[in-house]
């Protein structure tokens, strides 16, 4: 019984042991994943970088110094590439776009730089004795459009100017527009001179003299806006949204990538956007927040409205010298037509445009009544439509454009027709600089008539606010003044991204490297020592931080380049570099920095020159537990990058540590390289070394043989023995019953042999070598026989063990099978018995129901009886 109990316990132990072994085999069969580095993956991240310009500046009046291009932009690409990104959805935000800020700063720098060498008007900030210019004597043409210039619109002023001799002044005369001078004190001329007209006189000064530094634009400066393409340096790209109804914010499903934007004309204007891009389908309105009346509404039209502006009168320009090389240009006289400057546009086109704008505004503001009205007041640049036309700055009244009410059906006071709308304009020569406070520019008069044709492509609207939520009317006015909105109307569909070509993902492939145990070394502290922190360490300790030093070295190079760029930017007025020149230099240096950084990381990870690089870093499921099929077949690189974005720093550090350990292992392996591969022993380059060793061994053996022979002879001589010859036969002693032999060479000879002593040195060497080889052969043969015997025993034992395990596996398989069959039989019997019981109960219940009528009949019979 005791034996049977022990046998049962052993059987249970074998059963559980087999189950554990199977579980271990299943767990060990699970495949391991390893980090693989990929270079050139299509991944990007939002970034801000230095953009540079491309333009065909030489095609626009090469003899004129253009403010915008300055001939420093690179030529445009004749075949620009635009790559459509399929199945890509990207978020855009035109109101938080660094490209707008960068363009704004660039235009400011260009204005400042173009005016830097020009003449300051400080000597003209004196008292001007002005009267109304007499315009009655001019010839008036009968051309249509425009109104007569009002009396007093132009002032004839006299002032004192210092000549080339500083102690001598000279009186000069010049014509100034009424908007450019402000009165100091004003009165009427004395009655004795009041015989011809009611001309007023007074003391004036130039506007902005007390608050700004006025600079005269250089004579050959041209303000004609030419298309400027903003481009990204290498390593960056521009994403472009091609959705035709894109409102400026939110996701865009039709995305492409370009290297440069389209040609953007930096038109400085208010209220109306001129010569911009058009919407492809319907009118589009954009605002950062439509419910906030402070936010400007940018309207992009789908069809342009042509506006023709002109200054009819023919002005002459006179020069006033105030010193050597310093000349001030002013209006000498007005010849010919004395009508006001004005702009004409088609009423039908404008009304059709307003109708489409109203439709979009109603969609946004719940079908309310839309009222367009004039500006509520402010600076002339805001109240009037200001822009540059042929070098003169026009300020036009747009009340006729925005003076209508649109109810739910049609505009109430919107007059139709095909007539022309004429906007009266005034000209200012002293313009308050829009980009900075405290600066103003004097635009010298342009001689001759001025005409310019522009296209209205957009509007800048502001909405009146109010707390009355029940109001059914929304009032809109033309606005502007913030030039960022002008640039934003063109850059709304672009965003700059930084290309991240390095990607990591799990694969089944593992780098084949030297396998050694990782030793615990104190590298954590050294990682934070910095670039020069390991200078006082030993060479062994310093080699651990080589990657840290390489990284800090590159950071030092980048820092030096940034310092150089800042120095150049600070001294660009001495180096004569334009803002575009600075940006091109920054862009090119930035591209080199990006490339060096990527190559540095690849080198640190041991992946230089590889597009796909396997590593020995195991993939951690905590980074992403998705399967390989899910990752490689269902996710894009952008989605995968977002998945592991929080762990890329950890992965990079592990890759660096793994490569450091691998390099250390390889260094230790090189020290044992001669013993690493037995096949190298047969390398022909080692034969001379082998021959030399062989000669040394043979020489040593022969020398030992000679030494021992001499010592033996000396020992025998000392014992009184004198050898007759080296060939003397020394037979072994025999017994009396073993004769030496019989005649005829019969009989048995002794086994002992006495070989004759060899003659000569070479014969002696050969004899020793033969003895050595024979000894080595016999020993190797014995060793081989022992090894064969051991292998045979191991094989027999192994085969017996395999047969034992196989029989055990068969036994337990049969036991499991029998147990399963027994369990199934028991279950089947229990189910069958239960089913029989259920069927029997159901039959009894059914019989009871069937016997109810019989029981009723029997009861009635008993009752009747």
From Swiss-Prot:
Keyword Glycoprotein: yes
Region spans: V1: 130-156
Motif YXXL motif: where in chain: 721-724
Spans traversing the lipid bilayer: 694-714
A molecular-function term among this protein's GO annotations: structural molecule activity
Site (Cleavage): 519-520
Cytoplasmic side: 715-865
Immunosuppression: annotated segments: 583-601
GO cellular component terms, semicolon-separated: host cell endosome membrane; host cell plasma membrane; membrane; viral envelope; virion membrane
Region Fusion peptide, annotated ranges: 520-541
Residue ranges of the region described as V5: 468-479, 470-479
Name listed for the protein in its UniProt record: Envelope glycoprotein gp160
Organism the protein comes from: Human immunodeficiency virus type 1 group M subtype B (isolate RF/HAT3) (HIV-1)
Gene designation: env
